[in-house]
Amino acid sequence: MQDSPVQAVIFDWAGTIVDFGSFAPTSIFVEAFKSGFNFDINLAEAREPMGLGKWQHIEAVGKLPSVNQRWHQQFGHAMTSEEIDHIYATFMPLQKAKVADHAEPILNAIDVVNDLKDKGIKIGSCSGYPREVMDILIPAAAKYGYHPDYVVATDDLPQGGRPAAFMALKNAIELGVTNVSTCIKVDDAAPGIDEGHNAGMWTVGLLLSGNEAGLTYEEYQAADAETLSVAREKARLKLQKSTPHYLIDTIADLPEVIADIETRLLAGERP
């Protein structure tokens, strides 16, 4: 075991470690709006607030100007909390039924994680999924070899989820981290990057494997350089507003970032 100045890396789940393109939640949001109220949203609208807890995500979709306008046209008022509750109640069984189908690791994620563990770095994780979804996803991902040291779901803590620091800090506490400046938060969505900043950690945004690029793994594999460049810049525009310390394509590029942060920590730098 090598001694690293990095104590922990805290990963998001969908679009970061598993589920290339973060399709499990987005497609289900579209389905839940349709099933719950016969109301159509598109994938771009479903993706817009990704990273929040799912109830808050539905609320944020309802507040998008395009959705709010159509909701007013169809129902004569803005979306209410009761309507959000109904969509959420529709969403949950759909999500639980599908999430295990999206548990396959992204690229060489398992090797990257295991190499971090070999260096004595703890592996934390948190998600916008609630606990009842995570209870299905965790064992499904374990079958592929993903075994984080700790998992926090968005509804585990009474204080709430992203973009606040609570889930990241809960990981730090449970992993025995003595200094949050030795932690790295890795995420494909802005609220998760904000979470890392709010927790005083280094932050790494993922451009091509997650929600903002919205590519399937097959599209990613087949894409030429120009297509990837367009997808990369689309994601960069969204993620750079959260000013992550690093922006990389996928988890496959993370080892170089870890090495750089190790050098910076040893030189006395902090996030």
UniProtKB/Swiss-Prot annotation:
GO MF: magnesium ion binding; phosphoglycolate phosphatase activity; phosphonoacetaldehyde hydrolase activity
Protein's UniProt keywords contain Hydrolase: yes
GO BP, one annotated term: organic phosphonate catabolic process
GO cellular component: cytosol
Pfam families from the UniProt entry: Hydrolase
Cofactor list: Mg(2+)
Co-factor binding details: Binds 1 Mg(2+) ion per subunit.
Active site: 12 (nucleophile), 54 (schiff-base intermediate with substrate)
EC assignment: 3.11.1.1
InterPro entries for this protein: HAD-like_hydrolase_sf (IPR050155), HAD-like_sf (IPR036412), HAD-SF_hydro_IA (IPR006439), HAD_sf (IPR023214), PGP-like_dom2 (IPR023198), Phosphonoacetald_hydro (IPR006323)
SUPFAM superfamilies: HAD-like
Sorted UniProt keywords: Hydrolase, Magnesium, Metal-binding, Schiff base
Origin: domain of life: Bacteria
Amino acids binding Mg(2+): 12, 14, 188
Catalytic activity: phosphonoacetaldehyde + H2O = acetaldehyde + phosphate + H(+)
UniProt family annotation: Belongs to the HAD-like hydrolase superfamily. PhnX family.
Function: Involved in phosphonate degradation.
Subunit note: Homodimer.
Name the record gives this protein: Phosphonoacetaldehyde hydrolase
Organism name: Aliivibrio salmonicida (strain LFI1238)
